[in-house]
């Protein structure tokens, strides 16, 4: 009588499988595979060979704490002689004297996560022997055409899934600067932290069985991750802070990568890391999504609207000195705002609305009771389809709201100006396999001022008006800020709006910088006044300057001036202005943004003219030099050159340096004091442990500035 077949050991072929599944950057020691793609394993038997006619091998895969056949978190399937279509499948590849090689494949809709793999062997007379073969992790598969995250471009897959560094664009529309970032999605322990993040979500804590079953949907997973990146509803990864007081944590500007943040969250028992702002939330989310296999990129929107009441109007209030006031409505225009786009099919929406989807992890407004935003179809945003899930009205307003300026005087409000094109400029992301910037504004809206753009805006406005009677996706009634804001005379309607006297501009004001605004130097600019009428104009112009946070919140003004300008018909004049370093140095925010404003009025007319300009102060970047050839497992010297751009000494200088595949962990060097206008350098030693294109990111902070940054790309060769 034949003996029952006994398994001696199992080779999961982790190294070979992981290379084929594009997960070898994470590890080759443990099995990480992607759904919809076969992987191989070898069964070694103790007593004899596998006999297909005699032995029946049944595989069992389970994920989550409560595996369930009905929910799809448990699957049972037999070894077949040939590849045949079914949800989970296993087929015979080769059969030897003491071993058998088998291929397995998860369906392209399977839940992602950590799986347990077992087999049952039924050899004869009903005897069944069970074995636990091991664990594996299943990820989304952008290489599989049947997967909802399939991306039909290898360069895009390399950029949006495999690239572990990039740039996040900051500054202002007139001074866009790239901030280098280490995503590090393949670094040690990051995949485990990403899976823990899913398990710490409110969804899992409330109903773990259903949550695990839904992890096959990138729409669902992206919403869960989005909510978990911030800590407003749970023990998410990051605490947000826009107060300029970071004494009990890190200034958001100091971060240069996601790895340190995620590892700190994990090491402290999932206590939120202090602190983040929009680009940090988006960068960490990019790391998690790329690690899970969902193509993701980081997007920056300059002059980004935050419309709190859903009427597509951002109201700004000024006093008679031109100073911007704190907004009682909490509407703001962020100097820049950063979110993510994730690539996925949207079977929950009409056709053509798949592809890039906006997800915003910055906690601004609630969505279905939690702080997350999206996924919102970029195509739906462009077409004004604000009734499509999720949170499309909010994202539409970020890129296409109107801005209304009001003068507050004597308890009354006077309309100064209505701008239909100031919100949503230079929407940017890193180019594919390049360090250049891509402008993708046309993905979000038609050209400003075009007929299509006006039609889309009106369509969105009308949809919001209809929704205001039934509530919104965000659970709040949509209350227009002015009774006419949803009428046919609304901003950018197809009908010509009736103009108030303050809209009839006969005199224009404009600011012009005379020199590039550098940190530590005086700011020199002129106010240009132009009389476009055939009459004399006597102007009184109040000028002011105040620092801004990047979310648009104003700080106290630190400079004021008054100009009296007489203009002949058609005449232009300039009024020179200077703000010295000593005047602004004590008032700067971390973002180094200064808003200069001018409010002009005629002596003989109630007409008022408002103009403002945001100045971003620049400063020298860090220079990084690689000394010699970079080779895996061989010592490498790196020179970091930094300087103090100020005419005063700076204290408490700390340099941080990191780079995936180059440094095992973030390096911190305490530099102490830097003398005025002084340049210095240090040499760091490291041993690269991964080959290919890599990037070094560096940041220097001090008591005067927090984010002097630099980067250097490095190609690491294999060791001979």
Curated annotation (Swiss-Prot):
Keywords: Acetylation, Acyltransferase, Calcium, Cytoplasm, Disease variant, Metal-binding, Transferase. Transmembrane segments: none annotated. Ca(2+) binds at residues 400, 402, 448, 453. Its EC number is 2.3.2.13. It is found in: Cytoplasm. Residues 481-496 have a biased composition (Polar residues). Induction: By 12-O-tetradecanoylphorbol-13-acetate (TPA) and calcium in NHEK cells. It catalyses: L-glutaminyl-[protein] + L-lysyl-[protein] = [protein]-L-lysyl-N(6)-5-L-glutamyl-[protein] + NH4(+). Expressed in foreskin keratinocytes. The active site is at residues 278, 337, 360. The modification N-acetylalanine is found at residue 2. GO terms for molecular function: metal ion binding; protein-glutamine gamma-glutamyltransferase activity. One of its GO terms (cellular component) is plasma membrane. It is an enzyme of class 2 (transferase). Its cofactor is Ca(2+). GO terms for biological process: epidermis development; protein modification process. Disulfide bonds: none annotated. Binds 1 Ca(2+) ion per subunit. Belongs to the transglutaminase superfamily. Transglutaminase family. It is linked to Peeling skin syndrome 2: A non-inflammatory and localized form of peeling skin syndrome, a genodermatosis characterized by the continuous shedding of the outer layers of the epidermis. In PSS2 patients, skin peeling is painless and strictly limited to the dorsa of the hands and feet. It is accompanied by painless erythema and spontaneous non-scarring healing. Ultrastructural and histological analysis shows a level of blistering high in the epidermis at the stratum granulosum-stratum corneum junction. Catalyzes the cross-linking of proteins and the conjugation of polyamines to proteins. Contributes to the formation of the cornified cell envelope of keratinocytes. This is Protein-glutamine gamma-glutamyltransferase 5. It comes from Homo sapiens.
